Amino acid sequence: MLILLGYLVVLGTVFGGYLMTGGSLGALYQPAELVIIAGAGIGSFIVGNNGKAIKGTLKALPLLFRRSKYTKAMYMDLLALLYRLMAKSRQMGMFSLERDIENPRESEIFASYPRILADSVMLDFIVDYLRLIISGHMNTFEIEALMDEEIETHESEAEVPANSLALVGDSLPAFGIVAAVMGVVHALGSADRPAAELGALIAHAMVGTFLGILLAYGFISPLATVLRQKSAETSKMMQCVKVTLLSNLNGYAPPIAVEFGRKTLYSSERPSFIELEEHVRAVKNPQQQTTTEEA
């Protein structure tokens, strides 16, 4: 959980440094300031988003604390699946894939790759475009344009939760100032008190500015970046499918088509040419494929 680790680092360094200067943590405990900042931030989030955006943001929050499912093994499964589908269509004709795409969960080919079956976005993307290709009513350029449009739509939808969190993060420092000003107003209204008490009230008011900035840049705004990164991973998978299928439509053999798809992947997850070649060879031999997946 890198997010939780990052939060611990933020809290440890900020409050640890404060203690090193001789400060008291008790002075930073100001529930009223926190209520003002958090409440105003939540309120601005509700005001600035429609119901669809709010629901999408809440739905995206659990994804922040899950490990990425788009690993090297996932990409290898994707390329192997596409290879098997393309090889079958080349050997037996495109119409031989009808049963596979009509009910992929009962397909022998798809069943070999449970990680792909578990990803409804990728499964629908693959099946839908194979169905369009089989129909024969669209040429390569039309299919490519439609794929680009769907990928762009996915990215736009994924950007909504990220933007919502980013805007909340941007607003928190301002709400911290609001809380601080209200605290200063309270302190000035108590100007007849002794200097020691007045100083404590002003110090408490300044905690609002501190909390607003800390919550914004240490906790909320980084979450928007994580959501964008997760969206980019899904888009990369879709681009890999797009390039692979279009290469096959343009006449390239399945081994070359999956090589096109491999080249679109990020270097951190991209299998080497030899790894992909060995994986494709294993695909050609069902027994060897089963052994490889069990391992």
Curated annotation (Swiss-Prot):
InterPro entries attached to this UniProt entry: Flag_MotA_CS, Flagellar_motor_stator_MotA, MotA-like, MotA_ExbB_proton_chnl, MotA_N
Domain of life: Bacteria
Keywords: Cell inner membrane, Cell membrane, Chemotaxis, Flagellar rotation, Hydrogen ion transport, Ion transport, Membrane, Transmembrane, Transmembrane helix, Transport
Topology Periplasmic: residue spans: 22-33, 192-200
Transmembrane regions listed in the UniProt entry: 2-21, 34-51, 171-191, 201-222
GO MF annotations in UniProt: proton channel activity
Family in the record: Belongs to the MotA family.
Keyword Cell wall biogenesis/degradation listed: no
Complex and partners: Each stator complex is composed of 4 MotA and 2 MotB subunits; in E.coli 11 to 12 stator complexes can be involved in flagellar rotation. 2 A subunits and 1 B subunit are thought to form a single ion channel, so that each stator complex contains two channels. Interacts with FliG. Interacts with flagellar brake protein YcgR in the flagellar basal bodies. In another study YcgR was not seen to interact with MotA, but instead with FliM and FliG, also in the flagellar basal body.
Topological category with respect to the lipid bilayer: Multi-pass membrane protein
Paired cysteines (S-S): none
Phenotype upon changing residue 93 to E: Suppresses pdeH disruption motility mutant, swimming velocity is wild-type
Classification lineage: Bacteria, Pseudomonadati, Pseudomonadota, Gammaproteobacteria, Enterobacterales
Cytoplasmic compartment segments: 52-170, 223-295
Effect seen on changing residue 93 to V: Suppresses pdeH disruption motility mutant, swimming velocity is between disruption and wild-type. In the wt background velocity is reduced
Name used for this protein in its record: Motility protein A
Gene that produces this protein: motA
Protein's UniProt keywords contain Membrane: yes
Gene Ontology terms describing biological process: bacterial-type flagellum-dependent cell motility; bacterial-type flagellum-dependent swarming motility; chemotaxis; proton transmembrane transport
One Gene Ontology cellular component annotation held by this UniProt entry: bacterial-type flagellum stator complex
Pfam family, one: MotA_N
Matches recorded under NCBIfam families: MotA1 (TIGR03818)
